[in-house]
């Protein structure tokens, strides 16, 4: 089976399942060094095809999982007393959302999750993220996909940048995973978008260790 068919055979899908499956579908010549696959750019490129997506997960998936584990260590799960929605900014293949959903399931809170919004400029990665989320939550959660860049300081990207969000549930979890350190992102405009509603917001931010980066 190919990657998509394998993922569709796993319900409910977890982050461990995703990483394991991706490693199984790395091209043979890159099995030992998936990070050398052309076009990954050390994990910063906008991915375009299935092999790139699998090689990214095989290269960086476990490291990403470890950083998410640290970020969610003190998450206030006991405060999740109303319906929840997730907005995954620059979601890539949806790893942060999947990790959070894994945790909601462990805390018996998954039934409170009503909506997930996935925002990502790579159509290939966004399609993967939607597939992953659907296998993780089934049809009980509304999944919205938005194929946009985050607010940008680069003129050529502004026309394709997201201009607004629609929050429906009383609790909104914002996930920023390996995205806020990118210098082209307009943090001021992003902050405006996030603060445009009066709902209860929680922010989980994960980034690479870039010494000297003051963002």
Please place each PLM-identified region on the residue numbering.
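Conserved beta-strand signature within the Rossmann-like core of class I S-adenosyl-L-methionine
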Residues: 199-210
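N-terminal auxiliary segments of SAM/dcSAM-dependent transferases
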Residues: 1-38
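Conserved SAM/SAH-binding beta-strand->alpha-helix loop
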Residues: 122
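S-adenosyl-L-methionine
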Residues: 128-166
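A short glycine-rich, Lys/Arg-flanked "PGG" loop and its adjoining helix->strand segment in the class I
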Residues: 187-200
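Class I SAM-dependent methyltransferase Rossmann-like catalytic core
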Residues: 42-78
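Conserved SAM-binding loop of SAM-dependent methyltransferases across substrates and taxa
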Residues: 93-110
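A short SAM/SAH-binding and catalytic strip from SAM-dependent methyltransferases
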Residues: 169-185
